[in-house]
Swiss-Prot record:
Recorded family membership: Belongs to the protein kinase superfamily. Ser/Thr protein kinase family.
Residues bearing the modification Phosphothreonine: 287, 313, 390, 450-451, 456, 467, 547
List of residues that carry Phosphoserine: 371, 466, 471
SUPFAM superfamilies: L domain-like, Protein kinase-like (PK-like)
UniProt keyword list: ATP-binding, Cell membrane, Glycoprotein, Kinase, Leucine-rich repeat, Membrane, Nucleotide-binding, Phosphoprotein, Receptor, Repeat, Serine/threonine-protein kinase, Signal, Transferase, Transmembrane, Transmembrane helix
Organism for this UniProt entry: Arabidopsis thaliana
Domain Protein kinase: 290-569
Protein name per the record: Probable LRR receptor-like serine/threonine-protein kinase At5g10290
Residue ranges, Extracellular side: 32-225
Recorded superkingdom: Eukaryota
Topology of the protein relative to the lipid bilayer: Single-pass type I membrane protein
Length: 613
């Protein structure tokens, strides 16, 4: 008896094991099914050309969307002029939620295997040349909400199984050759259309062949009333939600997973799993095997490469080379999480990422005009120079980006390497703050943290350099130096100035010229005098307020934004001048006591602790 029980247990285990195997859909099987569909549809060589049969994971293919577990959830192949048939192998995609193949010339019948797509919520095969009967297996799709089979050549009766779809909201079967009686319960669906068939909409309880919602007649007044009512209702609901969230945040503060964007921005909360997962091979091909000719820069965690995806989208691929070292992998996870929730028009958006056993990569949009540093100092002869209006817009855009990081993210985000090289420029020369590799999430209860000093000499705030303590005021200092770069076109630290004067640091250089009222010697010669003197003076004043020695004296970024917009600068500048006179007298007194000399600095190079971006 005991032996018999063991045999039954073994058999049950074996059956369970094989059942699990059968229910598991591997990326290989998904890719094979999709590629079989491509063949059956008779796709041309230039259509779906990135669908590679040898690629394990189809989640990188065009028109395919996957979830965070690499299961295919959406396939959209609309208006591509296919002339083939549907493949029954699509039926293995049991996680597929949306299947759209409308507007093609697909022939043949709808496969019975489509009834295996049990996760499907939307099936759209409108405007094709499909023939045969509607499969009764469609009734297995209990989650189906939208079924659109309009404008085909389907015949036969409407299967009774469609009455067993509890979530169906839209049923559009018009313009076919269907015949017979329409099941009574289908008239209870909110939106239906059975017109242009040989169907019987009468019977014992006559019904219109099209629902009021689906009717396309000229009753514009009722439609207008409905639309107005819906819009008004939605407006009231949205206002109530916003009011609720505002009151909730006033009492409880920000939650970790919620951020408040500035006016005019769309709240786009992006979960980690919703970022695009790139295949290693895809990025390898995009960057020409990470060719040195495609290197855009090198940072503290690796190089950045220019890449081109199969759809000709240009990207910047950041390849992390030290993720196995302490902090490397954690830095990757921190950056992915941080960038994905910090969404603002003046912040660099993360497109996606790639992880393998040996690689960690981040993918960003490619900025057409590269960086502010490049446009200021590395343009070729004949290239357009940044005019003054563009420079003002860049200054304000970058300030708004840093304001968002400091004051609208919870916890706040400290960049810690603010400089012109990390302010990127899009196709419209709008400022886009990039490189969060050095960014640090700071607990709201702390104003600073002691950590390893990272940054670029000439941009690092004095308290950060001497103590390792950083805060948002550290970024404000770096931003002030960046403003001086924007005005002068010069580097933050330049030893060539030793030939003429002692001021190696751009900050000291500008302070000296400002005291001497030599504005023309400060402004970038490339502007060729095309600027407004008062506006340049205002920008220099903001820069000097941002670079005060004591972090407590520096404005926060929201104040910087207001000052750049013309509010509150005069009062702050007057206070600064009074303090600066006292500091200058003290400095001159100390200078008379000590011989500073030049030899200790003359042969040094600029030190970039984090590397170029």
């Amino acid at each position: 008896m005991r032996m018999f029980s063991l045999q039954k247990m073994a058999m049950a285990f074996t059956l369970l094991f094989f059942a699990c195997l059968c229910s598991f859909v591997s990326p290989d099987a998904q890719g094979d099914a999709l590629f079989a569909l491509r063949i059956s549809l008779r796709a041309l060589p230039n259509q779906l050309s990135d669908w590679n049969q040898n690629q394990v994971n189809p989640c990188t293919w065009s028109q395919v969307i996957c979830d965070d577990k690499n299961f295919v959830t959406s396939l959209t192949l609309s208006d591509m002029n296919f002339s083939g048939t549907l493949s029954s192998r699509v039926g293995i995609l049991e996680n597929l939620k949306t299947l759209t193949l409308k507007g093609n010339g697909i022939t043949g019948e709808i496969p019975e295997d489509f009834g295996n797509l049990t996760s499907l919520t939307s099936l759209d095969l409108e405007d094709n040349q499909l023939t045969g009967r509607i499969p009764s297996t469609i009734g297995n799709l209990k989650k189906l909400q939208f079924l659109t089979l309009s404008r085909n050549k389907l015949n036969g009766t409407i299967p009774e199984s469609l009455t067993g779809l509890p979530n169906l909201l839209n049923l559009l079967l018009d313009s076919n050759s269907l015949s017979g009686q329409i099941p009574q319960s289908l008239f209870e669906i909110p939106k239906y259309n059975f017109t242009s068939n040989n169907l019987n909409c009468g019977g014992r309880q006559p019904h219109p062949c099209v629902s009021a919602v689906a009717h396309s007649g000229d009753s514009s007044k009722p439609k207008t009333g409905i639309i107005a009512g819906v819009v008004a209702g939605v407006t009231v609901v949205l206002f109530g939600i916003l009011l609720f969230l505002f009151c909730k945040d006033r009492h409880k503060g920000y939650r970790r997973d919620v951020f408040v964007d500035v006016a005019g921005e769309v709240d786009r909360r992006i979960a980690f799993g919703q970022l695009k997962r790139f295949a290693w091979r895809e990025l390898q091909l995009a960057t020409d095997n990470f060719s040195e000719k495609n290197v855009l820069g090198q940072g503290g965690f690796g190089k950045v490469y220019k890449g081109v995806l199969p759809d000709n989208t240009k990207v910047a691929v950041k390849r992390l080379t030290d993720f196995e070292s302490p902090g490397g992998d954690a830095a990757f996870q921190r950056e992915v999480e941080m960038i994905s929730v910090a969404v603002h028009r003046n912040l660099l958006r993360l497109i996606g990422f790639c992880t393998t056993q040996t690689e960690r990569l981040l993918v960003y949009p490619f900025m057409q005009n590269l960086s502010l540093a490049h446009r200021l100092r590395e343009i070729k002869a004949g290239d357009p120079v940044l005019d003054w209006e563009t420079r003002k817009r860049i200054a304000l855009g970058a300030a708004r980006g840093f304001e968002y990081l400091h004051e609208h993210c919870n916890p706040k985000i400290i960049h810690r390497d603010v400089k012109a090289a990390n302010v990127l420029l899009d196709e419209d020369f709008e400022a886009v703050v990039g490189d969060f590799g050095l960014a640090k999430l700071v607990d709201v209860r702390r104003t600073n943290v002691t950590t390893q000093v990272r940054g670029t000499m000439g941009h690092i705030a004095p308290e950060y350099l001497s103590t390792g303590k950083s805060s948002e005021r550290t970024d404000v200092f770096g931003y002030g130096i960046m403003l001086l770069e924007l005005v002068t076109g010069q580097r933050a630290i330049d030893f060539s100035r030793l030939e003429e004067e002692d001021d190696v640091l751009l900050l000291d250089h500008v302070k000296k010229l400002e005291r001497e009222k030599r504005l023309g010697a400060i402004v970038d010669k490339n502007l060729d005098g095309e600027y407004i003197k008062e506006e340049v003076e205002m920008m220099i004043q903001v820069a000097l307020l941002c670079t005060q020695g004591s972090p407590e004296d520096r404005p926060v970024m929201s104040e910087v934004v207001r000052m750049l917009e013309g509010e509150g600068l005069a009062e702050r500048w007057e206070e600064w001048q009074n303090v600066e006179v006292t500091r200058r007298h003290e400095f001159e007194r100390l200078q008379r006591r000590f011989d500073w000399g030049e030899d200790s600095m003359h042969n040094q190079d600029a030190i970039e602790l984090s590397g170029g971006r």
